[in-house]
UniProtKB/Swiss-Prot annotation:
Gene3D superfamilies: Vaccinia Virus protein VP39 (3.40.50.150). Specifically methylates the N7 position of a guanine in 16S rRNA. Belongs to the methyltransferase superfamily. RNA methyltransferase RsmG family. Its main location: cytoplasm. Keywords: Cytoplasm, Methyltransferase, rRNA processing, S-adenosyl-L-methionine, Transferase. This is Ribosomal RNA small subunit methyltransferase G. S-adenosyl-L-methionine binds at residues 78, 83, 129-130, 148. InterPro entries: rRNA_ssu_MeTfrase_G, SAM-dependent_MTases_sf. It comes from Lactococcus lactis subsp. lactis (strain IL1403). GO terms for molecular function: rRNA (guanine-N7-)-methyltransferase activity. Residues 216-238 are annotated as: Disordered. Signal peptide: none annotated.
């Protein structure tokens, strides 16, 4: 997907990018490749692949109407090089984005990136989701939590649901179908106060399949969750 094909694909969803936004994506690509030589951000560095598998894929929640142009708060868990939240932020500058990442080098990259792209209302937090999930400054405060290829749902839900406001939505972006994952995660979702709402299945322009699971927070998460760092991955709620 060339940059021009990226722009053309967005117009099919009635999204027209300004010159500023086009340049922001271009600079994003340049910085991603430049920093990737110093720290491991992504295995995908070829320009057309970045535009397809990082930029286009990241904005799927916008393309399919799950996130609209409103000043809602989004927490991105394990965003790595800023996916999916920062491409969405470029499209909808009103979004209030917070990113948690456990690697300080990635936070340094994201700090430079957001400054270079002129993105405001982006908060970067260095640490573990399990720790921030017990912090009253962040717990139960977000409209959306996004996570792209971070962990299986049975683990991911413990990382994410505690951060949501009541009626907030977890958007879990997955490459493959997750029926088996969803079955494994039913106990965790219910225990944490969530409810599976629906799955959005779609294809990238090259035919690759993608899926987004929507899980809504229906009631408060018990105080014991998330458990201490490392425990959810080693011992998922069953």
């Amino acid at each position: 997907m060339t940059p021009d094909e990226f722009l053309s694909a967005l117009t099919e969803f009635d999204i027209q990018l300004s010159d500023k936004q086009i340049k922001q994506f271009e600079r994003y690509f340049e910085l991603l490749v430049e920093w990737n030589e110093k720290i491991n951000l992504t295995a995908i560095t070829e320009k057309n692949e970045v535009y397809l598998k990082h930029f286009y894929d990241s904005i799927a929640p916008i393309l399919y109407g799950l996130i609209t142009d409103q000043p809602v708060s989004i927490l991105d868990i394990g965003a790595g090089a800023g996916f999916p939240s920062l491409p969405m932020k470029i499209i909808f500058p009103e979004l209030k984005v917070t990113i948690i990442d456990s690697l300080n080098k990635r936070i340094n990259f994201l700090s430079l990136l957001t400054e270079e792209l002129g993105l405001e209302n982006v908060t970067l937090l260095h640490g573990r989701a399990e720790d921030f999930g017990q912090d009253a400054n962040y717990r139960g405060t977000f409209d959306f939590v996004t996570a792209r290829a971070v962990a299986r749902l049975s683990v991911l839900t413990e990382f994410t649901i505690p951060f949501l406001k009541k009626n907030g939505i977890l958007l879990s972006l997955k490459a493959a179908q997750f029926e088996e994952e969803l079955n494994d995660a039913k106990k965790a979702i219910a225990t944490l106060g969530g409810k599976f709402i629906k799955e959005v299945a779609y294809e990238l322009p090259n035919g690759d399949e993608r899926h987004i699971a929507l899980i809504e927070k229906k009631k408060e998460t018990p105080k014991k969750y998330p458990r201490k760092a490392g425990t959810p991955a080693k011992n998922p709620i069953k």
